[in-house]
Amino acid sequence: MNTLITPAQAVASAFTDGEYLAPEAIGEGDIAAAEQRYIVPVIGRAFHEKLLAGLHAGFTAEYLAAPVALFTRIAVQPRLDIRTGQCGTVAPKSGSYQPADAQSLRELQRSLRRQARTLLRLSLIHISEPTRLRR
């Protein structure tokens, strides 16, 4: 599957140093779905295809990698907050950590979405300037 960023890039960009997550927790399908849902409607399918082909790699790295990573996190966060196993679907809990309450999860989602949208708007400002991204 062809995506603008790799799972390792998504993890490195969307999660802070204190939040360990193995890159395998995010798949290319997660990234592709986030791109289709949040990025393509804004930049257009034709431009997205050009970016996937490697054109404007600097623009992708500087302006789109972070919002793609954050939108990917928004999409996978609910799945990361629970585990499914032989006992069904459960929230992880240990002596040191407790599952976040619903309000905290909503606030995290809002914060991530706000940051991702702001970064995506910044990319639009960049490509709307007449001297940028000609081809």
What are these model-derived regions, one by one?
Residues 1-23:
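Short, intrinsically disordered N-terminal pre-domain segments
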Residues 24, 58-66, 102, 106:
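Short, charged/polar micro-motifs that form catalytic or ligand-binding hotspots
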Residues 24-53:
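Glycine-centered helix-coil hinge/cap
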Residues 49-53, 85-94:
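Short, glycine/acidic-rich hinge or "gate" loops at secondary-structure transitions
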Residues 61-89:
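Elongated alpha-helical scaffolds
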Residues 67-70, 74-75, 109, 115-123:
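Small-residue hotspots
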Residues 88-118:
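An exposed acidic His-Trp-rich patch
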Residues 123-133:
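Residue-level detector of conserved catalytic or cofactor/ligand-binding positions
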